[in-house]
Swiss-Prot record:
Protein name in UniProt: Gene product 5.5
Organism of this sequence: Bacillus phage phi29
Record's keyword terms, sorted: Early protein
Species classification: Viruses, Duplodnaviria, Heunggongvirae, Uroviricota, Caudoviricetes
Protein family according to the UniProt entry: Belongs to the phi29likevirus GP5.5 family.
Length: 66
């Protein structure tokens, strides 16, 4: 079965926040120290990004569950 996976990237200077699940529950902050964040949806992620002066990029990819 083919499923769609969306990745949210919050770009704040050299700070990259990636999400790895559809519900934005698991977001990994790629930086010197890793921290976990959870966003209910992309709009919430967008608000957070705006507050810290960044931007949100939504990337949608497909993957096959074997």
């Amino acid at each position: 079965m083919m499923e769609t996976q969306e990745k949210v990237l919050v770009l704040v200077g050299a700070l990259f926040i990636n999400t790895f699940n559809l519900n934005y529950k698991s977001i990994v902050l790629t930086h010197d120290s890793e921290q976990a964040y959870g966003f209910k949806d992309k709009w919430e992620a967008q608000k957070v990004a705006a507050n810290v002066g960044g931007q949100v990029v939504i990337r949608t990819t497909s993957f096959k569950i074997v």
